Regions:
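Hydrophobic alpha-helical transmembrane segments and their immediately adjacent juxtamembrane loops
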Residues: 226-321
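Peripheral, non-transmembrane regulatory/ligand-interaction domains of membrane transport proteins
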Residues: 1-216, 220-223, 227-237, 290-292, ...
Length: 321
């Protein structure tokens, strides 16, 4: 689906143009054009990216091919950016969808394979307020994109706190707890993998060495970079807490295993006197004085009970029970 918006002197003057009208507007130096490709078909991709804007083949290839990491490329006439936005339409705890941007002096082209809340919010905002250029539009999009990471962070923090409580609980299901720990660890690893390169992309825009970003917008991009830096620091902190919880779980599991081994060892030690006495009198010798004694059975039972009792007292003092 193709959405298009035309701005003149900061005001929205037209939207959802036909293909030929898009070509004319793109060639008009006095107008600002934003084209949003939302889940486009192959034909729409070719018509817009190649037909209207004539983007570099490598940029188009990077756009249509999913990329796991954010990046930015300068193609002289425009900047090409790969970013990742939170995908709220999926059921995963943390999932992202790629949002690609082509930023020129008088145009902005966005491309995404799934509906994005950040794009929808930006569209609603520009229809109600004044848009002042492609760089301002790009900042608005990226600002909403970064803001949408906060609900994910809050959800992951809540899951982390719940896991920390379950790790210390005595009756927690071990296999389920391990699966949850590994799942949340994967979410945090994914988040850190995305946030750091995305911060580098924004940092390059905030430096002031790009002709596509006006100086008056640099403080806004620097603020965006700082927000991503705080997001990264928070993700690192949560990841460290998660690894600490994982270490506590492993130590707890090892302790519980040792307690089980300790109990079995104590049980073996308690039965050892009976085994020794039974083995002694079970030897196949013809001449054993105790075998002829009328009280031999009682002696053997008494010796067994006394040895067992002494073993129990000893293990009690060692706190094996």
């Amino acid at each position: 689906m193709i959405h298009s918006f035309v701005f003149s002197e900061g005001k929205l003057v037209s939207r959802d143009l036909e293909l030929e009208a898009l070509r004319l507007v793109h060639g008009d130096k006095g107008l600002i054009l934003w084209v949003d490709l939302d889940q486009p078909t192959e034909e729409e991709i070719k018509l817009i990216l190649e037909g209207v804007f004539n983007f570099h083949p490598l940029a188009i290839e990077d756009c249509v091919t999913p990329s796991s990491l954010p990046k930015i490329e300068d193609y002289e006439d425009y900047l090409f950016m790969v970013t990742h936005a939170v995908d709220f339409s999926r059921t995963d705890k943390f999932a992202t969808t790629e949002l690609d941007l082509f930023l020129g002096k008088e145009f902005l082209v966005t491309f995404h394979r799934s509906p994005l809340r950040s794009v929808a919010t930006a569209l609603e905002r520009i229809t109600k307020s004044t848009a002042r250029g492609p760089d301002r539009l790009a900042h608005t999009l990226l600002d909403h994109l970064v803001d949408n990471y906060q609900p994910v962070m809050d959800e992951l923090r809540a899951e982390l706190e719940e896991l920390e409580e379950n790790v210390l609980a005595r009756d927690s299901a071990q296999q389920k707890l391990v699966n949850e720990l590994l799942s949340v660890r994967g979410d945090f690893s994914r988040l850190r993998t995305i946030v750091r390169p995305q911060r580098d992309v924004i940092d390059r825009l905030a430096r002031g060495d790009s002709k596509f970003i006006r100086p008056l917008l640099l403080p806004y991009f620097r603020d965006l970079r700082d927000n991503l830096a705080r997001l990264e620091d928070t993700a690192v902190n949560y990841h460290e807490r998660l690894m600490m919880a994982f270490d506590i779980y492993l130590n707890k599991a090892a302790f519980e295993a040792n307690e089980g081994i300790k109990f079995l060892t104590a049980l073996t030690a308690v039965t050892l006197p009976a085994v020794l006495v039974g083995g002694w009198y079970g030897m196949n010798f013809e001449h054993m004085p105790e075998l002829k004694s009328p009280h031999g059975y009682y002696y053997a039972c008494g010796l067994t009970l006394l040895s067992t009792l002494l073993m129990v007292v000893y293990l009690k003092r060692k706190r094996w029970f």
